[in-house]
Structures are given as C-alpha cells and as structure tokens.
C-alpha cells in the first residue's frame, strides 16, 4: 500500500514443516528460513513504515519455540518495523513481547482481517491461499493469486509451504458479492488472468 508505506502479507505458516514431525511425517525443514529471508529482503527493498500481518504467521501456537537461532534473529529483524498483527486461525493464541494482536484492524477506510467477513466493506484478508490454474503454451501452470473486487481483496499465501485453494472453489462465492478479478504471481510480475470456467 504505497500511500501508507505499508507491506501487507498473510499466511506465512512459519514452521509448518516441523509441525508434521509429531505425526511421523518429515518435510525438508527449510520453509521458515526461505519465507523469512524473502520477507526481510522485500522489507529492505521497499522500506515500508509498517508491516501488516493478516494472520497465520505461525503454523501453530508453539511454532515460535521451534525456530532455530538464525530464524529467530531474522524474525526479530523483521519486527523492528512497526507491526500490525492480525490473529489467524492457526496462531490465534500466539503471544510475543511488545506485539499487540488484533482480531481485525481498521486503517483509513480499510478493514484488515484474517478470514473475510461478508459484512465488511473495503476489506483486505488472507486465509484461503487462493491459486489459479491455467494453460500457458500448452503447459498447465498453477500460481498463487490475488482475488479482487470493488470491496474486497484476498491475498495469496506468503509462506513457502502453504499450498492453495483453487479459485474454482465455491467457497469464494461466499466471500465475493460481485465478480472478482484474478492476478497471478509470476516470477517477476503480477499477471491479470481471465476467468474461463
């Protein structure tokens, strides 16, 4: 958000890979370092005055305790910015020194929440991890995406191991009253995608 010098991200799901160990499943434990390094790099590049986290920063309430020393330092470096922390469904009991958490947050006319509420006007949310699948030069491609209409924006998940809910899901009909636009994350730019269902 250029006018407010704000960086808005959701669904980092830090330490998702290590959360599966208790279930006997092992994933390469590099999701947290990748996500934090990308976030720190973008904060250095854009120099926002504030970061607005739209929930599920951590995959569970004990994830912070599983961070390695380097990851904790990266996290602390990111938190040197002014932080608005909206709680998600995965980290709703997370507490960290000197960080106030919100169930939703209003800035100017916008409401920032983790899960979209149909009653909210001018809302920016996360939670659904939207993704779009399309063909490009005969190859099927799936990409995280923004979903945007006149009143709402749903952000793509920022975390490395987040997966996604395809835009063809009926769940999005419960969020958007109007038809929405799709903007997929490319390697170097955001691409508008035409809906063809």
Protein language model features and the residues they cover:
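Extended recognition/assembly regions associated with phosphoester-bond processing machinery
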Residues: 1-54, 58-197
């Amino acid at each position: 958000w250029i006018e407010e010098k704000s960086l808005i991200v959701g669904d980092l799901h830090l330490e998702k890979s290590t959360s599966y160990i208790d279930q006997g499943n092992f994933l390469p434990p590099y999701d947290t370092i990748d996500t934090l390094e990308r976030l720190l790099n973008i904060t250095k590049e854009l120099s926002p005055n504030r970061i607005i986290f739209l929930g599920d920063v951590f995959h569970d309430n004990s994830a912070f305790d599983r961070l390695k020393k380097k990851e904790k330092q990266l996290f602390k470096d990111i938190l040197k910015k002014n932080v608005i922390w909206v709680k998600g469904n995965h980290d709703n009991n997370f507490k960290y020194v000197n960080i106030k958490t919100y169930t939703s947050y209003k800035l100017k006319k916008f409401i920032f929440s983790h899960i979209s509420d149909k009653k909210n006007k001018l809302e920016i949310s996360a939670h659904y991890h939207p993704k779009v699948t399309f063909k490009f030069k005969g190859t099927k491609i799936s990409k995280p995406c923004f979903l945007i209409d006149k009143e709402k924006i749903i952000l793509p998940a920022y975390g490395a191991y987040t997966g996604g809910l395809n835009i063809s899901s009926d769940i999005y009909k419960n969020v958007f009253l109007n038809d929405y636009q799709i903007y997929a994350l490319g390697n170097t730019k955001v691409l508008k995608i035409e809906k063809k269902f």
